[in-house]
Amino acid sequence: MSIEFKNVDYVYAPGTPFQTQGLIDISFKIEKGSFVAIAGHTGSGKSTLMQHFDGLLLPSKGEITVAGEQINANTSSKALKAIRKKVGLVFQFPENQLFEETVLKDVMFGPLNFGFSEQKAKEQAVEWIKKVGLSEDMMDKSPFELSGGQMRRVAIAGVMAYEPEILCLDEPAAGLDPEGQKQMFEIFKEYQRAGHTVILISHNMDDISEYADDMLVLDHGHLIKHASPQEIFSDQEWVKKHYLDEPATSRLTRELQKGGFQFSEMPLTIESLVSKVANELKKKGDMDE
């Protein structure tokens, strides 16, 4: 088991006039090595939930287990450091986690902070700077001289350089062009294939349907659905009711069904849809012979 929540509540500004319930009685389990998407409309609690994974926020009530480590309302700062070595969090706004004077130093910070030698930290940083698509001539530049998309790549490299067991990503493709988005998601998927757990917050249902194998849907601090993307996107009425967008493949599949195509299950990628359509056409061709 990678992550387990048991009856978790989170309250912002408790005991003040600004008290707000951020999470309400949340319980779920995430298996090690899975790619999990967190979806829901703005203000549903997605980022609040993710910030509990590394103890950036502590639950007001309930218990969390992350990679064998326990988190509750009384977890100490010392215990949290062990958790944060196992959980890497990339924020929605990369400028919030960049602070060093050069790109290389910024990406080295995580490995150094978690006990890597100077040489090993530099090797890891250089490797991941290249993996996320940045050139070597950027390593000595200030991260604040870069474009928004480049800053996002630096922030991602800075977390992945110490190779945490669990990688948490809050809208990681924002600010990237379509080619850059695909490149980054392939990196995340490869990271999952290497045995790590990847957790994604995204408003883009196409990304979720293509890359995730598990999905949590939040609404006003409640967990209202925990299922596979295939199960969730197969229920068009439920998706509409909870203000989620349908992936493009789901919409296209429904149009094909209106034209007489039959699918035993909802294809979630263009590749799988093309394959299923080709099989249907072949069956029809065989029947006509």
Swiss-Prot record:
Its main location: membrane. It is found in: Cell membrane. One of its GO terms (molecular function) is ATP hydrolysis activity. CDD domains: ABC_cobalt_CbiO_domain1 (cd03225). ATP binds at residues 40-47. Forms a stable energy-coupling factor (ECF) transporter complex composed of 2 membrane-embedded substrate-binding proteins (S component), 2 ATP-binding proteins (A component) and 2 transmembrane proteins (T component). PANTHER family: ENERGY-COUPLING FACTOR TRANSPORTER ATP-BINDING PROTEIN ECFA2 (PTHR43553:SF27), HEAVY METAL TRANSPORTER (PTHR43553). Belongs to the ABC transporter superfamily. Energy-coupling factor EcfA family. NCBIfam families: ECF_ATPase_2. This is Energy-coupling factor transporter ATP-binding protein EcfA2. It comes from Lactobacillus johnsonii (strain CNCM I-12250 / La1 / NCC 533). The gene is ecfA2.
